[in-house]
Amino acid sequence: MLKIGSHVSMSGKKMLLAASEEAVSYGATTFMIYTGAPQNTRRKPIEELNIEAGRKHMELNGIEEIIVHAPYIINVGNTTKPETFQLGVDFLRMEIERTSALGVAKQIVLHPGAHVGAGADAGIQQIIKGLNEVLTPEQTVNIALETMAGKGTECGRSFEEIAKIIDGVKYNEKLSVCFDTCHTHDAGYDIVNDFDGVLNEFDKIVGIDRLQVLHINDSKNVRGAGKDRHENIGFGHIGYKALHHIVHHPQLMHVPKILETPYVGEDKKDKKPPYKLEIEMLKNGNFDEGILEKIKAQ
């Protein structure tokens, strides 16, 4: 079974149940959530996440596995502000606890961190230090380091940087990788014409068995732009054909594929989620040039 879904919202009183209902309405077989707002660390207690009802709904609809994404504000790569580093460490520990409580997520996607001017090597050493403070041999969930576009002072912009982080971490069996198509393209990898070659390079440097999550996004920018701006499937510089090939790649069939493409519409207050129609289009193998108008009309 193709594991494909999108980022969905876990909010209100229904929490996990709301997320599962939204995912099912898109025809998804997996989904990704933030356990609270991605831009802050305010979180509801575990008992208010409505886990039991959410899991029951998932089971009834054949969803076995979901992904958690850590908030953007975590930066364990920060060498200049000890309080930012410490917040990242403490919050990651909490996220591991919350994700374990969900019982249906095995991966927490994490942007590795930004070196904020200290240089990539210093940032990577700080990320290693942070992960060594967080990871334990007993934990049942992995931290999935996301491949980054190389915007600003981001670490993890190359497979070598990801491998360096993994190699420095003591309990690195608890580390995996989230391969983001937009980020990897923006970082300079030719996933359009030679995805198999890129995957082979990833396997040599990091190990393909570490690739446990895929973020499926088109890109508004040319390859190597280092920008990180997601585009709807088939309307960017990666294109439908390449993304369809990645989604159905025989070596990655077991990997959950998560869409983080932009909502569609001119009116900021009335944008529509593209996921139902994009998932359908990636399943059926035919690019629909009129899909954006259909999304707006939903």
From Swiss-Prot:
Disulfide bonds: none
Alphabetized PROSITE patterns for the sequence: AP_NUCLEASE_F2_1, AP_NUCLEASE_F2_2, AP_NUCLEASE_F2_3, AP_NUCLEASE_F2_4
Binding-site positions, Zn(2+) 3: H183, D228, H230
Domain of life: Bacteria
SMART domains: AP2Ec
Any Pfam family matching the protein: AP_endonuc_2
InterPro entries (UniProt xref): AP_endonuc_2, AP_endonuc_F2_Zn_BS, Xyl_isomerase-like_sf, Xyl_isomerase-like_TIM-brl
Xref: Gene3D superfamilies: Divalent-metal-dependent TIM barrel enzymes (3.20.20.150)
Entry's Gene Ontology BP terms: base-excision repair
E.C. no: 3.1.21.2
Required cofactor names: Zn(2+)
Keyword Transmembrane: no
Positions contributing to Zn(2+) 2 binding: E146, D180, H215, E260
Cofactor note: Binds 3 Zn(2+) ions.
Catalyzed reactions: Endonucleolytic cleavage to 5'-phosphooligonucleotide end-products
Binding site for Zn(2+) 1: H69, H111, E146
GO molecular function list: deoxyribonuclease IV (phage-T4-induced) activity; DNA binding; DNA-(apurinic or apyrimidinic site) endonuclease activity; phosphoric diester hydrolase activity; zinc ion binding
SUPFAM superfamilies named among the record's database cross-references: Xylose isomerase-like
Enzyme class (EC, first level): hydrolase
Keywords assigned: DNA damage, DNA repair, Endonuclease, Hydrolase, Metal-binding, Nuclease, Zinc
Family: Belongs to the AP endonuclease 2 family.
Annotated function: Endonuclease IV plays a role in DNA repair. It cleaves phosphodiester bonds at apurinic or apyrimidinic (AP) sites, generating a 3'-hydroxyl group and a 5'-terminal sugar phosphate.
Protein name in the entry: Probable endonuclease 4
Provenance organism: Bacillus cereus (strain G9842)
